A protein has these predicted regions:
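Long C-terminal subdomains/extensions of small-metabolite kinases
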Residues: 1-155
């Protein structure tokens, strides 16, 4: 984990913030971001807990972002992690059901992979929409009590 946090810390030092046009649930939150994530799990990579309250069964995604002006705060958090200190991610999350953004030819991570791939050339700007659809996924989960029936979770 230390290697990954160290790499992120080095990259963050001079990583340029990019202007993103983003709406979540119809509200404009456009701005210059170093990082933003739409998450339904608590962590990315090796135990980087960006959304500690994210849950796969709550019917929402968690929006996490670090704006350009927040760079020093994120640097201090990563420094603390590298020093072995316990440090909670210092930015809040926002629950949402629908996100819209415009992708403008830069490479970004989508589900832990770079998009577009290195061999592909970025196309013209495209609108991307991420939406939570009720009951789109059915998860069978064993009950906490082994004597109880299994429960069905609708997402």
């Amino acid at each position: 984990m230390t290697r990954h946090v160290s790499l992120l810390r080095r990259m963050l030092h001079d990583y340029p913030a990019r202007k993103w046009r983003i709406q979540i649930d119809g509200r404009d939150i456009s701005g210059r971001y170093i990082l933003w994530e739409a998450m339904n799990i608590r962590s990315v990579g090796p135990a980087l807990f960006l959304a500690p309250w994210a849950a796969t069964k709550d019917g929402a995604f968690d929006f996490v972002c670090v704006r350009e002006d927040d760079r020093p705060i994120l640097m201090r958090h990563l420094d603390a992690r590298l020093a072995g200190e316990k440090s909670k991610f210092p930015f809040s999350t926002r629950k949402f059901r629908k996100l819209k953004t415009v992708w403008k030819k830069s490479t970004f991570h989508f589900d832990d992979k770079l998009w577009p791939r290195k061999k592909q050339k970025p196309g013209s700007p495209s609108e991307i929409e991420i939406t939570v659809k009720p009951s789109a996924l059915l998860i069978l989960q064993p009950a906490a009590n082994l004597n109880a029936r299994s429960q069905i979770i609708h997402r």
